[in-house]
């Protein structure tokens, strides 16, 4: 085969949200590339299967790039959440990335000076910014002059903090938009 390397764009949804979240920032909920996959959504399950299928093919080297929630100039989740009521997981940390960083990271992998360091790897790609969903979306609604979202404060919160330390170390990547 003439294909030597495959860069597969995946999602942090492959980790799932099965851990209850303690507001005291319990370190056991920090997710790295070594964390076992536990997808809960259909799309998360399909992405995990695709990752495994590509990684098991010895005809080429596959690098998996798992992006968090995407934010861009015309794309922001507050536009969907503004004015909604009973939103779950208010204390869960956000795990998002700006589209400028997505492009920077992809280019960083494709143009890396030492290809052996970046192929056959898995990288999480999430901005190092993890306020609670309630704090973040409330502030963004105010910033965009939108109706405040209302959160369900009665139920147990589930969530995770996804770390991109490996990406920053191996690629030497510095986030263009570290604060979203």
Spans of model-derived segments:
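Conserved catalytic-site region of short-chain dehydrogenase/reductase
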Residues: 9-20, 29-30, 39, 70-74
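Mid/C-terminal beta-alpha module of Rossmann-like enzyme folds, strongest
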Residues: 105-108, 112-164
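Substrate-positioning beta->alpha
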Residues: 64-70, 76-79, 87-110
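Catalytic helix-loop patch of NAD(P)-dependent Rossmann-fold dehydrogenases
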Residues: 19-64
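A short C-terminal helix-loop "cap" of Rossmann-like NAD(P)-dependent dehydrogenase/epimerase domains
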Residues: 81-89, 144-150
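Amphipathic terminal alpha-helices
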Residues: 179-180
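NAD(P)-cofactor binding segment of oxidoreductase domains
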Residues: 1-9
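Structural element of the ATP-grasp superfamily
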Residues: 54, 167-168
């Amino acid at each position: 085969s003439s294909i030597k390397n495959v860069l597969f764009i995946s999602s942090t949804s492959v980790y799932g949200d099965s851990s209850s979240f303690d507001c005291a920032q319990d370190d056991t909920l920090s997710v790295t590339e070594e964390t076992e996959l536990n997808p809960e959504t259909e799309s998360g399950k399909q992405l995990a299967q695709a990752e495994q299928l590509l990684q098991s093919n010895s005809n080429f080297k596959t690098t998996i790039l798992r992006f968090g929630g995407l934010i861009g100039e015309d794309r922001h989740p507050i536009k969907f959440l503004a004015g909604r009521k009973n939103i779950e997981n208010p204390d869960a940390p956000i795990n998002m990335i700006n589209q400028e960083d997505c492009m920077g990271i992809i280019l960083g992998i494709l143009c890396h000076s030492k290809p052996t360091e970046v192929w056959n790897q898995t990288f999480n790609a999430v901005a190092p910014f993890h306020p609670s969903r309630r704090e973040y979306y409330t502030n963004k609604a105010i910033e965009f002059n939108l109706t405040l979202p209302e959160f369900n404060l009665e139920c147990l919160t589930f969530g995770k903090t996804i770390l991109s330390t490996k990406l920053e170390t191996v690629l030497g990547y510095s986030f263009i938009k570290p604060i979203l």
